[in-house]
Amino acid sequence: MANKSTENGIYSVSGEEKKGPLIAPGPDGAPAKGDGPAALGAPGSLLAVPPRETWTRQMDFIMSCVGFAVGLGNVWRFPYLCYKNGGGVFLIPYILIALIGGIPIFFLEISLGQFMKAGSINVWNICPLFKGLGYASMVIVFYCNTYYIMVLAWGFYYLVKSFTTTLPWATCGHTWNTPDCVEIFRHEDCANATMANLTCDQLADRRSPVIEFWENKVLRLSEGLEVPGALNWEVTLCLLTCWVLVYFCVWKGVKSTGKIVYFTATFPYVVLVVLLVRGVLLPGALDGIIYYLKPDWSKLASPQVWIDAGTQIFFSYAIGLGALTALGSYNRFNNNCYKDAIILALINSGTSFFAGFVVFSILGFMATEQGVHISKVAESGPGLAFIAYPRAVTLMPVAPLWAALFFFMLLLLGLDSQFVGVEGFITGLLDLLPASYYFRFQREISVALCCTICFVIDLSMVTDGGMYVFQLFDYYSASGTTLLWQAFWECVVVAWVYGADRFMDDVACMIGYRPCPWMKWCWSFFTPLVCMGIFIFNVVYHEPLVYNNTYVYPWWGEAVGWAFALSSMLCVPLHLLGCLLRAKGTMAERWQHLTQPIWGLHHLEYRAQDSDVRGLTTLTPVSESSKVVVVESVM
């Protein structure tokens, strides 16, 4: 433990035993980065510590969280899961798991960031032995930043192609079309077919121009992962444009990001309302909405329904990525993060439910026009965005207008999720750097390097075999399995190692009152049990990755996928094991020492109630003349 002395009510710690970004000085005597100006080091020494940014207005934080958490999954995944898993019945497990798992962890991550004033890694100074959770979240969000932007690139490509009198995916006869291309078909035309359970496309071996545009023009799909092929330069330019947009949204920090999200987070709602009004006026729209909500009570007995509800909650709430922690770290210390978390969770789930009406009104129209059951046109993920919906708009009057509106909404939904994800990664990265490494334009250069590295990796996804690479990232790197693992350990560490009551007191110190005891019980029991239960089910019933129900990935492709997943999941046990092995003393002494919190400089405003700084459990406001500097000792 560090040597401590007290002078005029201020604790000081010997410089050679201090480390990390929350205190100063570094090995060369230069100040380390912190959260506010302070006097540190030997008595009488003054070290300037750069202040941490805060949101200009609290609404900036709200809109940033809405922009990040409300994304493509709310629009293209939730409606399909609701339809597939019993319609309105799916809302029962969805709401239950949101109350038991989603909202408590959502609140936990935001409040942790606000209390510790640190990004995804240094926030775990609250229990340094489990700092591997921070490294794991950095790995996951890096993967997300890498592959998620591909959806933006495809959406931008479709948006550009929408500015024509005739949509290119509406007709055959293009260079990318095959002789099997057919523009319009109806199920009644197959009345004489011998296999009534097949569609016209399947019976006649015909292909829609929408599918051929997607596979032959946009993806230029090769035979498999082992055949990468050449770059698609049109999509590559769209990808580059998206990364440039992300860079200029993030490069100046949260003060500029907080302004941009006012547009990127709100305008998609305007488009959703416009699309809903248009959709409900189309023939067959009511049938689609009925199928979306029609309850099938037998589905409640299916474990898969509960698994789908759980994975959707954790994915759509953006839990385990560290970005919510980073956003919360820019709040004022006394911001009511409890109220914010409840509001944001309601907005997130409400958007998912509302988007279902938009999607299924269009799918109902599409099924009516083609004379097929809605199950034949209902899709999720990229299949909905780039096949089902583009096909539906070709059947509407003024098709280019509705296509442009949809893909512009898609671009905005993905853009704010993307640049807030990059913001979370950069925040965690810069928090690690001591002030001795500080230089002008540090943030701008760091963001540029991050965007460039991700862009180079993304080039593997704009080749002919790029879709297979994208699917690997999507299925393994930031899957429900990795997020559930992350959420489980977050709850265990805060509730059982740091202490649930202790953290409730810390939250009360920030917001002025203790949150509902339900939060404490969820962190301690219900949420970890739900997370581990769904995690085990996912692992036991894991199915090998298959693309489009036809292409089975080779064994080495599966191995790469599992490497993605394990690269984040192993951060927690490996870091824990490494710290315990390096520490000295008995195992009990090592555990006790390594689980003691490391307090940051922003706690200057608060006093430890007992004389041992390392034993801080409750913080209370004090006057300017009686502050305590709480710092870390060497691990």
Swiss-Prot record:
Positions of modified residues (Phosphothreonine): 617, 620
Transmembrane regions: 61-81, 88-108, 139-159, 231-251, 270-290, 305-325, 342-362, 395-415, 445-465, 480-500, 521-541, 561-581
Record: glycosylation sites: 192, 197, 548
Gene name of this polypeptide: SLC6A8
Function: Creatine:sodium symporter which mediates the uptake of creatine. Plays an important role in supplying creatine to the brain via the blood-brain barrier.
Phylogenetic classification of the source organism: Eukaryota, Metazoa, Chordata, Craniata, Vertebrata
Region of interest (Disordered), residue spans: 1-27
Cellular location(s): Cell membrane; Apical cell membrane
Reaction catalyzed: creatine(out) + chloride(out) + 2 Na(+)(out) = creatine(in) + chloride(in) + 2 Na(+)(in)
Name of the featured protein: Sodium- and chloride-dependent creatine transporter 1
Composition-biased stretches (Polar residues): 1-11
Gene Ontology MF terms in the entry: creatine:sodium symporter activity; gamma-aminobutyric acid:sodium:chloride symporter activity
Extracellular side: 82-87, 160-230, 291-304, 363-394, 466-479, 542-560
